[in-house]
Design a protein with these regions (language model features):
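Active-site neighborhood of phospho(di)ester-bond hydrolases with catalytic His/Asp-centered motifs
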Residues: 28-30, 59-65, 93-101, 139-140, ...
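N-terminal active-site segment of His-dependent metallophosphoesterases
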Residues: 17-75
């Protein structure tokens, strides 16, 4: 039974129910990135709505970046897909959605947000709703934090003690889910406000974190969950052969009197991820016993293990423009807990002795099958014999039993076209000021900054109809490794085909990227979501293949 009382503009909601009764079932999506040039984005949003309809949700939320850029027709498309899938207006679920930065790229914040609200039918920029006895408050990107502060205070006044308050944001609170350690990934003002509301359950987007990532749920002073993305996912923080892959994430939330159950889905086929073990949040919230706080996860989350008989085989790739070979091996036990593989390389010298050469880490892009295959470029590996230790690592940094092997690297037929480039660095993703290095060649930078690629090599690549290969050493002082490295064009759009980072030490890594310029515009290497610090570039080389 639901009770709703209105007092002085504050909605007082309460629910009387048994422990086994679902009080509210709602869906969550984010980062649709609808784009008129990419019809596949339409399909993924439609599939999410169809999933919500199949599971008979009462309500759903969309956490922003609905369009890839300011495209009013994409706001209209969102509304049309919603109306088509939920064709019966009498049973159509309500929704709460907020605009975000991509929704206004190409116009002003005011124009972008105004058209978003008008054409999607969201009602307002920062909607507040009470659905079946539960408060939902929201704040759109770039809106004043005081809006969140006031709406949370009102919701807390209108909710019984211990009842969850759902908070919808685009940027996650800082230092919660993956990708939120810097100002370009997480919001410190949200975090400061939410620390005072242990009953808050935050649902956010922005970082394109996969829902299969077990770190997408976090508990500390409150609970935070990343809603994933319906567009693409970047491999934040770890080098990988595959830059990005398409994403089909949606979740369905079931709220009970004593818990919240979060079920994760792939909208492409409607299948639930890990149906035997959905995320469960006990109610009311208790920080010490919260199952998804880092201390409990480090202690209880399983570690992937290779068995003693695991054999890793090397297969050369003789006719590939970007890869010199693959490593093939059986998936480890407890593969669901697997986040990445760490490959430690040793190189054989002329005396036949092996010495430490460096480390490569590979993110797992999808649920592991019976066999795994890792493939990568050779721009930083000289022709030689190598041996390796391959270790599975879980989402919280714990390593399992490693496997070992050897391989030989052949010479890659690349043609070097430039090796005397002096770094030209600007702040920002596509705009910003030119940065000046200090006497030792270090650039002081925070968050996003970019290394401009020489225009003559772009022209040469287009003229010769060759792919362009870039190899760059990056040294960091006073900062963690850059979270993401991407090649972007003059408009700031990511164009990299393939890349990998080779970590030679805690401070230095070699980055190799392969891409094909499409026109004679400006291109840059974007260092994205990095921590503030000093960066120096060295061993910069360009090749054609």
């Amino acid at each position: 039974m639901k009770k709703i009382i209105l007092l002085s503009g504050i909605i007082l909601c309460s629910v009387v129910a048994t422990a086994g009764e679902v009080l509210l079932r709602f869906g969550a999506i984010s980062d649709n990135h609808l784009d008129r040039t990419r019809p596949a984005t339409f399909q993924r949003t439609k599939q999410a709505f169809e999933l919500f309809k199949k599971h008979n949700v009462d309500f759903f939320v969309d956490c922003g970046d609905v369009a890839d850029t300011y495209q009013p027709d994409m706001f209209q498309l969102w509304r049309r897909l919603y109306s088509e899938v939920f064709s019966d207006a009498g049973t159509r679920p309500d929704f709460l959605m907020i605009p975000a930065g991509h929704d206004r790229i190409g116009t002003t914040w005011e124009q972008g947000y105004g058209d978003f609200v008008k054409l999607t039918g969201s009602g307002t920029v920062n909607p507040v709703k009470c659905i079946r006895g539960f408060h939902f408050v929201s704040i759109a990107q770039k809106e004043k934090p005081d809006i969140l502060k006031q709406n949370l205070a009102n919701a807390a006044t209108g909710s019984p003690a211990g009842t969850p308050i759902f908070v919808i944001t685009h940027y996650p609170p800082m230092n919660t889910t993956p990708g939120t350690s810097s100002a370009s990934g997480g919001d410190k003002n949200y975090r400061a406000i939410l620390n005072n509301y242990p009953q808050a359950v935050v649902i956010s987007g922005h970082t394109h974190t996969r829902l299969m990532d077990e770190r997408a749920i976090w508990q500390g002073e409150f609970t935070a969950v990343n809603a994933g993305t319906l567009a693409y996912t970047d491999n934040a923080g770890i080098a990988n052969a595959t830059e990005r892959c398409y994403s089909y994430d949606a979740s369905i939330w079931e709220v009970y009197k004593n818990k919240i159950v979060i079920r994760r889905f792939n909208v492409a086929d409607g299948r639930e991820m890990y149906p035997d073990s959905p995320w469960e949040i006990p109610l009311p919230f208790q920080k010490k016993n919260a199952p998804y706080n880092r201390e409990n996860r480090m202690k209880n989350f399983p570690v992937p293990e290779f068995n003693q008989e695991t054999a890793v085989t090397f297969h050369p790739v003789r006719h590939s423009w970007d890869r010199w070979g693959t490593l093939n091996f059986p998936s480890p036990e407890n593969s669901r807990s697997l986040n990445r593989y760490r490959l430690v390389l040793e190189k054989c010298n002329s005396d036949g002795q092996y010495g430490h050469h460096g480390i490569i880490e590979f993110v797992r892009n999808k649920a592991a099958g019976k066999m795994e295959c890792l493939s990568f470029s050779a721009g930083y590996l000289e022709p030689a014999n190598y041996r390796f230790t391959l270790t599975p690592v879980n989402y919280f940094g714990r390593s399992g039993t490693p496997a070992h092997g050897k391989f030989k690297v052949r010479k890659v037929p690349w043609k070097e076209i430039k090796n005397d480039y002096v770094p030209v660095v600007f702040s920002g993703r596509k705009e910003g000021q030119k940065l000046t290095p200090d006497s030792e060649g270090f650039f002081s930078a925070a968050s996003d900054f970019r290394l401009v690629l020489p225009h003559e090599i772009i022209e040469r690549s287009i003229q010769d109809k060759k792919k362009l290969i870039i190899s760059i050493g990056i040294e960091c002082i006073g900062a963690g490794n850059p979270a993401r490295l991407r090649i972007v064009n003059g408009s700031g759009r990511i164009v990299t085909l393939d890349s990998i980072c080779f970590r030679e030490s805690a401070q230095r890594q070699q980055y190799t990227a392969v891409f094909r310029p499409s026109d004679k515009q400006n291109y840059s290497l974007l260092i994205r979501n990095g921590d503030p610090g000093k960066y120096r570039f060295s061993n910069i080389r360009f090749y054609l293949y």
